[in-house]
């Protein structure tokens, strides 16, 4: 029996994608091979690779000024790869810290330069807000400004993206990419691990403006130098072929759903249902300012936290899995990515109401 999986990542995949992958496991399109067995330079895999790149460009409306790269190492590796590729002769990059992941990015950048904390969304209740542009204290000549536009752990999503003029804006979009349309032209770099909305763990997507490809530090490994990766069409070293294949299936699924405008409407409906339930309750609490509440990752706390384990056990009995909050913040977290259906959120809300009534 399939359950409703609210994992923050690796996360739920569309059932259509899983079934197609299962059907093609032993024989992809009459090739007699699994995608896992293909040469990454053979015509079979190259057709998968090129289709995935093209479909992602179409879905996000990526302009010709930007290259799409498939790398490895996830978002955490990009915390090092970004400064190694962008600092160049400059030593300073600015960071707007809105949660645990942008804090990790800030800390990692200290190994390669002098990161500057331009603004922080931390409050007495933790990370609960996204500082407005007027609050940012940018340095004089930063190599770039870094944001995490959706904080997976803290549930803070930044929707308003300012124009920074000539300063490249770098965004970690790991946990909301493909959940809504984005104006890619506003960004110098977008990066994200695949294991939330793109597909399975193993491939990292980087979208980088072409004019930023010549800024790498000399210490940057060749396999992580964006210019080298771009020049080799993301095939400089053996890529994560099966992860790219799964991502390609997800891209095709998204197109069948009507693209990002349609998926955004679905995500808004799911998030509203869950937040409305939390806010109407005297038993559940979300601490994030409403204007920046994440549509993808919804943390919430029980009024009586001694009942956390009972809540999780009851949820599991109903087929509602992976609801435990991150260890750094506690409580609960429902990750409601693209592949989580509205029916799953309705089932969760029904259970939350039942659990609250039993404890009243």
Swiss-Prot record:
Cellular localisation: Cytoplasm
EC number: 2.6.1.52
CDD domains for this protein: PSAT_like
UniProt entry keywords in alphabetical sequence: Amino-acid biosynthesis, Aminotransferase, Cytoplasm, Pyridoxal phosphate, Pyridoxine biosynthesis, Serine biosynthesis, Transferase
Catalytic activity: O-phospho-L-serine + 2-oxoglutarate = 3-phosphooxypyruvate + L-glutamate; 4-(phosphooxy)-L-threonine + 2-oxoglutarate = (R)-3-hydroxy-2-oxo-4-phosphooxybutanoate + L-glutamate
Residues that bind pyridoxal 5'-phosphate: 101, 152, 172, 195, 237-238
Function: Catalyzes the reversible conversion of 3-phosphohydroxypyruvate to phosphoserine and of 3-hydroxy-2-oxo-4-phosphonooxybutanoate to phosphohydroxythreonine.
GO CC annotations on file: cytoplasm
Coiled coil: none
Cofactor binding remark: Binds 1 pyridoxal phosphate per subunit.
GO BP term (any one): L-serine biosynthetic process
Name of the protein described by the UniProt record: Phosphoserine aminotransferase
Associated pathway: Amino-acid biosynthesis; L-serine biosynthesis; L-serine from 3-phospho-D-glycerate: step 2/3; Cofactor biosynthesis; pyridoxine 5'-phosphate biosynthesis; pyridoxine 5'-phosphate from D-erythrose 4-phosphate: step 3/5
Residues bearing the modification N6-(pyridoxal phosphate)lysine: 196
Family statement: Belongs to the class-V pyridoxal-phosphate-dependent aminotransferase family. SerC subfamily.
Gene from which this protein is expressed: serC
Taxonomy of the source species: Bacteria, Pseudomonadati, Pseudomonadota, Betaproteobacteria, Burkholderiales
KW DNA-binding (keyword) present: no
Binding site for L-glutamate: 41
Cofactor: pyridoxal 5'-phosphate
Superkingdom, natural source: Bacteria
Keyword Transferase: yes
Sample GO molecular function, one term: pyridoxal phosphate binding
Pfam families reported for this sequence: Aminotran_5
Major localisation: cytoplasm
Organism the protein comes from: Burkholderia ambifaria (strain MC40-6)
């Amino acid at each position: 029996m399939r359950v409703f999986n609210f994992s923050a990542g690796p996360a739920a995949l569309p059932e259509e994608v899983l079934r197609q992958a299962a059907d093609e496991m032993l024989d992809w399109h009459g090739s007699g091979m699994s995608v896992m067995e293909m040469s990454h330079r053979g015509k079979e895999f190259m057709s998968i690779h090129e289709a995935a790149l093209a479909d992602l460009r179409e879905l996000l409306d990526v302009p010709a000024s930007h290259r799409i790269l498939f790398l490895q190492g996830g978002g955490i590796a990009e915390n090092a790869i970004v400064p190694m590729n962008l600092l160049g002769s400059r030593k300073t990059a600015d960071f707007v810290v809105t949660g645990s992941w942008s804090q990790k990015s800030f800390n990692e950048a200290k190994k390669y330069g002098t990161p500057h904390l331009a603004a922080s969304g931390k409050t007495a209740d933790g990370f609960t807000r996204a500082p407005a542009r007027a609050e940012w204290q940018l340095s004089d000549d930063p190599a770039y400004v870094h944001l995490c536009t959706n904080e997976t752990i803290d549930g803070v999503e930044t929707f308003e993206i300012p124009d920074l003029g000539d300063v490249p804006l770098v965004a970690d979009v790991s946990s909301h990419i493909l959940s809504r349309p984005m104006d890619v032209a506003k960004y110098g770099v977008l990066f994200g691990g695949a294991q939330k909305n793109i597909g399975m763990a193993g491939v990292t997507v980087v979208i980088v403006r072409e004019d930023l490809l010549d800024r790498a530090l000399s210490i940057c490994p060749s396999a992580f130098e964006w210019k080298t990766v771009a020049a080799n069409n993301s095939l400089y070293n053996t890529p994560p072929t099966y992860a790219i294949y799964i991502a390609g299936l997800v891209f095709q699924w998204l197109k069948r759903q009507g693209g990002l405008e349609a998926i955004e409407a679905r995500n808004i409906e799911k998030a509203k249902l869950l937040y409305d339930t939390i806010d109407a309750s005297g038993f559940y609490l979300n601490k994030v300012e409403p204007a920046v509440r994440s549509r993808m990752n919804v943390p919430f706390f029980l009024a009586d936290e001694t009942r956390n384990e009972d809540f999780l056990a009851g949820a599991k009995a109903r087929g509602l899995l992976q609801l435990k909050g991150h260890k750094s913040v506690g409580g609960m977290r429902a990750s409601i990515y693209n592949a989580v259906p509205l029916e799953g959120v309705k089932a969760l809300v029904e259970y939350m109401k039942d659990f609250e009534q039993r404890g009243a």
